[in-house]
Amino acid sequence: MNTSQIVLMFCLVVGVAQTALALKEDDCEVCVKTVRRFADTLDDATKKDYKLIEADFKKFCKTQKNKEQRFCYYLGGLEESATGILNELSKPLSWSMPAEKVCEKLKKMDAQICDLRYDKQIDLNNVDLKKLKVRDLKKILNDWDENCEGCLEKSDFIKRIEELKPKYTRSEL
């Protein structure tokens, strides 16, 4: 083999390895979806200045809940955040880097960013509430921003969910 063939083979192997190592949306779902949603809120002028992106991200984080709020905490987008790697988000976004690549860089800085996963949604029209754990019943109510005053038994939580079900779920026609 001559030198050019060896170089070509090396480049091919490196290219295949990079493709295999590339982050997929499922590997880092909360990061990718949150970065995409945030990037979609930015106007053209803001996208060019990483300082403005950081300021907008902090505003964006104030409205987030659950997993997205935890993501903001890890990056330093919340006032109570212990660390701050916000520039690892803002600078790549100012260069129009795709969300997957941004999250790949963030994962190298802090691996727990990609450990965040969305909870599986419970299909209330098809699930038997009696078979769920109390923890899951409480989570359903919490997701609806509802509480169950005086609920002690599982049957109390089920009764409350059944009362609220028409308000929060749509039945398919």
From Swiss-Prot:
PANTHER family: ARMET-LIKE PROTEIN, MESENCEPHALIC ASTROCYTE-DERIVED NEUROTROPHIC FACTOR HOMOLOG. Its main location: secreted. This is Mesencephalic astrocyte-derived neurotrophic factor homolog. Pfam families: ARMET_C, ARMET_N. The keyword Secreted applies. It is found in: Secreted. Required during the maturation of the embryonic nervous system for maintenance of neuronal and cuticular connectivity. Essential for maintenance of dopaminergic neurons and dopamine levels. The keyword Disulfide bond applies. InterPro entries: ARMET-like (IPR045333), ARMET_C (IPR019345), ARMET_N (IPR045332), EF_Hand_1_Ca_BS (IPR018247), SAP_dom_sf (IPR036361). Keywords: Developmental protein, Disulfide bond, Secreted, Signal. It comes from Drosophila grimshawi. GO terms for biological process: dopamine metabolic process; dopaminergic neuron differentiation; neuron cellular homeostasis; neuron projection development; synaptic transmission, dopaminergic. The gene is Manf. Disulfide bonds join C28-C114, C31-C103, C61-C72, C148-C151. Belongs to the ARMET family. It comes from the Eukaryota. GO terms for cellular component: endoplasmic reticulum; extracellular space; synapse. Residues 1-22 form the signal peptide.
